[in-house]
Design a protein with these regions (language model features):
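Short, low-complexity N-terminal intrinsically disordered segments enriched in polar/charged residues
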Residues: 1-44
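A beta-strand edge to alpha-helix "cap/lid" segment located at domain peripheries
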Residues: 2-14, 63-130
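A solvent-exposed, acidic/Ser-Thr-rich amphipathic alpha-helical stretch
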Residues: 17-21, 35-88
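Sequence-pattern detector for short linear motifs
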Residues: 25, 52, 126-127
């Protein structure tokens, strides 16, 4: 993040309304399936644990999302606020997608988010199951 990058409200500490708004903003960005747009919500050195995969920094986030959406076609996501405290938010999610053979899948899971003081996500941990 450079000095000219504006904060991303709402900023922590979160109340219920701000946490719900942050979740909706993330849902909208992910449903755009635009890796660059999604990556801008994270700090330049953001770290992710996505099941067994570890991602660090915006460039790796963009690469991860490109790979993900190349195989998860017609991706559609719903995120729901689960809990929040201070600069942390927990989310439940469900999404549907199909592979290139036309087989549809549904994935469920939870995410734990930690934000910096400027409203950028600095840490994201996810657990997910496919059905």
């Amino acid at each position: 993040m450079n000095a000219t990058e504006a904060p991303r409200p709402p900023l922590p500490p979160f109340d219920a309304e701000a946490a719900a708004r942050k979740v909706r903003m993330a849902e909208d960005a992910w449903n755009s399936r635009d890796p660059q747009r999604v990556s801008l919500a994270y700090t330049p050195d953001s770290t992710w644990r996505n099941r067994a995969e570890f991602v660090s920094g915006r460039a790796e986030i963009v690469a991860f999302l490109r790979r993900k959406w190349a195989r998860e076609l017609d991706y559609r996501l719903i995120k729901e606020l689960w809990a929040f405290h201070g600069n942390r938010i927990a989310v439940r999610f469900a999404y549907e997608w199909r592979d290139d053979s036309g087989q549809w899948y549904r994935s469920y899971g939870n995410e734990n988010w930690e934000f910096d003081e400027r409203g950028f996500m600095q840490r994201r941990k996810i657990g997910r199951a496919h059905v």
